[in-house]
Amino acid sequence: MSDNMEFPTKRMRRLRKSPQIRNILRETRLHPSDLIYPMFVSEKLGRGDVEAIDTMPGQFRYSVDDAVSEASRLEDEGLSSVLIFGMPSAKDELASAAHDPHGVVQRTVRRLKEETDLVVMTDVCLCQYTSHGHCGIVVDGEIVNDETLEVLSRIALSHAEAGADVVAPSDMMDGRVAAIRRSLDDAGFQDTLIMSYAVKYASAFYAPFRGAVSSAPAFGDRRSYQMDPANIDEALIEAELDLREGADILMVKPALAYLDVIGKVRERFSVPLAAYNVSGEYSMLKAAIKSGYLTDEAIYESILSIKRAGADLIISHFAPDLLGVI
């Protein structure tokens, strides 16, 4: 190291001496366009019937009307994107309601595209729609992969037909991106993007979400299709496979406990990268803030760390909290 890189010649505190200097030298910045807000829309609710989610303070289940109103309000505050999760009034073993053209997600998407300029993304999965709560078709107690692909393709196509800009398969079945891309292209939806939950771990941090949408599995767990939290090389293989199959955007989920994975995926692939700041990460921060152990500044810092790790887009329940801050 040369002499001019040593103290007292080199003084790093010069770079931090005022808010103005710190601001112009800041390496990582959050912008409202970085944020995607996940919204829960229930077919069982009517206009004005907004349900608080006990496991996720400050989050709600909305009717179609109220979801559109809330999304429009947040758009006025700077939000650019939403990710829609549906909750049907009836479930069955084959997730039939998930690809109903008049289903809750499909109706919400149509309204959002008519009444807002938001980028509308949709979650493509079976778990909220199956009576058993698994993300795939079950045959003799086994989650079967290839039979599930046809259902996923039908769901994604129904979302595209409703006007979704981006479909986001979250099931973790092998080959789902290729199947969905083929289905969309064959139907003339070549311009519909796929944001793949490429690297989705079998995480304990999903627990509040499963309570929010009543999607906990009725038997077993999801470890036969979601990834082992111990693995990182596998994450790179999953990401590459999804890119080869036609994914436009990759996603890592969860985010905060997997910042190293986000960094590795960012380093390897020069494609748009999303990260999901999941329900457990949200709820534990909310609980700590409510108890006085942390301040609201921890929200900004945690989301900033996801951006710094390499994510271009951040799906977060904190989006409304951040719109007035960043």
UniProtKB/Swiss-Prot annotation:
It comes from the Archaea. It holds the Pfam family ALAD. SUPFAM superfamilies: Aldolase. It catalyses: 2 5-aminolevulinate = porphobilinogen + 2 H2O + H(+). 5-aminolevulinate 2 binds at S279. The active site is at K200 (schiff-base intermediate with substrate), K253 (schiff-base intermediate with substrate). SMART domains: ALAD. 5-aminolevulinate 1 binds at R210, R222. The keyword DNA-binding does not apply. Its cofactor is Zn(2+). Keywords: Heme biosynthesis, Lyase, Magnesium, Metal-binding, Porphyrin biosynthesis, Zinc. The keyword Nucleotide-binding does not apply. Zn(2+) binds at C125, C127, C135. One of its GO terms (cellular component) is cytosol. Mg(2+) binds at E238. One of its GO terms (molecular function) is porphobilinogen synthase activity. Pathway: Porphyrin-containing compound metabolism; protoporphyrin-IX biosynthesis; coproporphyrinogen-III from 5-aminolevulinate: step 1/4. GO terms for biological process: protoporphyrinogen IX biosynthetic process. It is an enzyme of class 4 (lyase). NCBIfam families: PRK09283.1. PANTHER family: DELTA-AMINOLEVULINIC ACID DEHYDRATASE. Homooctamer. Belongs to the ALAD family. This is Delta-aminolevulinic acid dehydratase. It comes from Methanothermobacter thermautotrophicus (strain ATCC 29096 / DSM 1053 / JCM 10044 / NBRC 100330 / Delta H).
